[in-house]
């Protein structure tokens, strides 16, 4: 082992002394398979899940990378649809180190009308670390919001701004990026949420490689590796980006990565881009093939916001135009965007020629610090949807088979509703 690797492992081991002995987080849960992320369980570990007295052994896939420490993913297969399972992670002596629960997705097609469901979307998560936080500031707070989100019993949670904002000192270190995410999962308030509901990670600037970086910055490989070690997402699409898709009931989710291929270069034939050709082409092809009523496109940067700053997808003007034109040309119905990357929340309604309005739900800080006043001139913002306090979003899909609808709602740290708006599926099918 090289000196460099020895030092990294020593750093991880030292940091682990202040963490709980074992951490778990439910990852991707499908109809017949489920994934559970774990950390701090030693080199010899086993995983089981049970339902109705039947036990399933999990295949263990250990994380790779210098900073991985004792993390990995347990994959449970051969499960039954729409079933509640309890899982446990055990050491080599058989002692249960951590446990939790999950419910597999429904298998309704050709059997029943699509089931109603709701899921959570989270913005910036900031777990305070005084040693590395900006001086004279306490950026994070109201951690009871995790319990408020858990009380809504989401079918799953989407972390649209990552799990924990990186500090300046983290940006040049793979192990620091990894540990920043691990620390966020050690809070007592968050454990009940992440160990009992599925969680999907999104590549987000704040937690991927730092807000001011792009793919041309140093240590992009470290950022990619740390992300992989921290999540139990579905398999990423080919091409290097962290994009993936999954289905739930009559909805399909296309989770994009606007970090790996993000480039701000604007010179000669080069123009700023966030997705890259391969990822953009995959998205368009996948949307065209999808038979789902609702097609949720998830990315860190708001799509509908027209202000061309680096915080918004509008800064990648060419890609935005290509995708917008394609959605009209190919007559893709039911598309809804979900985003974050803002110190406030809002719902945008993008009016476009030839097709129905595109809705973009942008979630503000979950535990990060929100702004007191919104100054950005987003003229597509839905009236009364501005949220300038810590909050989370719940997206509900419900209604009879011939009259489905999606409802966007924001909630505060106590679980109180701040805003709600419902859009009928029929409105998301109109083309000129």
Protein language model features and the residues they cover:
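Metal-dependent phosphoester/phosphodiester hydrolase catalytic core
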Residues: 22-432
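Bacterial N-terminal signal peptides that target proteins for export
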Residues: 1-8
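General helical structural elements
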Residues: 8-9, 324
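N-terminal compositionally biased, intrinsically disordered segments and leader/signal-like regions
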Residues: 3, 18, 49-51
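Bacterial N-terminal signal peptides
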Residues: 9-17
């Amino acid at each position: 082992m090289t000196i460099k690797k020895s030092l990294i492992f020593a750093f991880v081991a030292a940091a682990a002394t202040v963490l709980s002995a074992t951490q778990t987080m439910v990852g991707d849960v499908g109809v017949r398979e489920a994934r559970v992320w774990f950390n701090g369980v030693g080199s010899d570990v086993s995983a089981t899940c049970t339902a109705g007295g039947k036990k399933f052994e999990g295949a263990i896939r250990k994380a790779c990378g210098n900073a991985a420490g004792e993390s990995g993913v347990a994959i449970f297969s051969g499960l039954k649809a729409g079933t509640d399972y309890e899982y446990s992670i055990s050491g080599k002596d058989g002692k249960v180190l951590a446990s939790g629960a999950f419910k597999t997705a429904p298998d309704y097609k050709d059997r029943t009308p699509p089931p109603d469901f709701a899921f959570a979307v989270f913005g910036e998560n900031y777990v305070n670390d005084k040693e590395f936080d900006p001086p004279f500031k306490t950026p994070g707070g109201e951690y009871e919001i995790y319990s408020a989100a858990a009380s809504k019993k989401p079918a799953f949670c989407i972390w649209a701004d990552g799990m924990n904002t990186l500090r300046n000192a983290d940006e040049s270190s793979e192990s620091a990026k990894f540990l920043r995410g691990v620390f966020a999962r050690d809070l007592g308030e968050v454990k009940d949420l992440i160990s009992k509901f599925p969680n999907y990670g999104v590549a987000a600037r704040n937690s991927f490689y730092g807000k001011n970086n792009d793919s041309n910055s140093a240590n992009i490989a470290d950022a990619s590796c740390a992300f992989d070690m921290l999540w139990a997402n579905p398999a990423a699409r080919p091409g290097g980006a962290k994009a993936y898709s999954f289905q739930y009931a009559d909805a399909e989710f296309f989770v994009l990565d606007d970090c790996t291929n993000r480039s701000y270069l604007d010179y000669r034939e080069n123009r700023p881009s966030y997705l890259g050709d391969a990822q953009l082409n995959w998205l368009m092809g996948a949307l065209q093939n999808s038979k789902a009523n609702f097609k949720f496109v998830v990315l860190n940067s708001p799509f509908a916001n027209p202000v061309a700053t680096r915080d918004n997808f509008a800064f990648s003007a060419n890609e935005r135009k290509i995708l917008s034109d394609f959605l009209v040309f190919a007559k893709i119905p039911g598309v809804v965007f979900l985003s974050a990357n803002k110190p406030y929340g809002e719902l945008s309604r993008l009016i476009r020629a030839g097709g129905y309005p595109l809705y973009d739900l942008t979630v503000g800080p979950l535990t990060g610090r929100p702004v007191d006043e919104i100054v950005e001139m987003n003229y597509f913002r839905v009236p009364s949807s501005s949220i300038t306090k810590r909050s989370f979003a719940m997206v509900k899909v419900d209604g009879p088979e011939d009259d489905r609808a999606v409802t966007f709602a924001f909630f505060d740290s106590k679980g109180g509703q701040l805003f709600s708006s419902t859009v009928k599926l029929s409105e998301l099918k109109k083309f000129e």
